């Protein structure tokens, strides 16, 4: 299991649900969660979202406004786009699009985040031609690739600042965090600001409110 995410609250979905990408089994686990206030905590495995053999689903992101889920596969470098639907209050996931997240078949796709505006989707890629892939989110929730920006070595994790103006990239092998400005077209532009963390190697980055 590489990540655990709560499904955002949606009008047609009843209760609380957890999704967990299981890279080794090529599935995303769907788990029903009952909170302590409701008689829990109880976790019940409800089902799985299957992926192609060897794809390796790693991280997911949600667009609650459009009712979409995006899943980045580490091994195949593909981005799977799902529509989230309801079957009697239970979430169902309908595959809408599959695209190659980068152009390099590097086998090291890592992190994924949606811009606060909902207009752009970003993914990071390692092992060859390391960088960030940028996609435009269409009105129907599908994506259209916009470009690719190189980063320092091994961008394992990144975040978008809450104001949507900057991207901070944690480059594990470079032992640094690199700062990018996001221009009007959603493209990351290097600022030249790099925070060295040597001898530590950053593997995750987050802002705590």
Segments and roles (model prediction):
Residues 133-181:
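C-terminal hydrophobic structural anchor segments
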Residues 72-84, 88-122:
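Oxyanion-binding "anion nests"
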Residues 40-49, 91-100, 144-150, 189-197:
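Beta-propeller fold detector
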